[in-house]
């Protein structure tokens, strides 16, 4: 079978899909590891691990009260 320039065979397309999927898996693993390290660092400093929940629960208000003292 002859392919025009720029066209890929089915095997090459599968390889590209596999490479892209592998890259995505690695990126997700790195992001997850970074989040985990960040959360552990925050816990060691005595802060809640999830800053989004912290803000939703009034963490900003607690900080303001603390600053007034």
Swiss-Prot record:
One GO CC annotation: cytosol
GO biological process, one term: protein localization
GO molecular function: protein kinase A binding
Location of region: Disordered: 39-69
Basic and acidic residues composition bias: residue spans: 41-50
Tissue note: Preferentially expressed in the neural tissues.
Record's function text: Protein kinase A (PKA)-binding protein. Binds to type II regulatory subunits of protein kinase A (PKA) and may block the A-kinase anchoring protein (AKAP)-mediated subcellular localization of PKA.
UniProt domain comment: The RII-alpha binding site, predicted to form an amphipathic helix, could participate in protein-protein interactions with a complementary surface on the R-subunit dimer.
Quaternary data: Binds cAMP-dependent protein kinase (PKA). Interacts specifically with RII-regulatory subunits of PKA (PRKAR2A and PRKAR2B).
Protein name: A-kinase anchor protein inhibitor 1
Source lineage: Eukaryota, Metazoa, Chordata, Craniata, Vertebrata
């Amino acid at each position: 079978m002859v392919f025009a320039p720029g066209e890929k065979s089915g095997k090459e397309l599968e390889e590209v899909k596999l490479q892209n999927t592998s890259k995505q898996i690695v990126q997700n693993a790195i992001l997850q590891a970074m989040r985990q390290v960040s959360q552990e660092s925050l816990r060691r400093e005595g802060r809640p691990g999830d800053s989004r929940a912290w803000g939703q629960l009034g963490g900003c208000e607690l900080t303001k009260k603390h600053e007034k003292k």
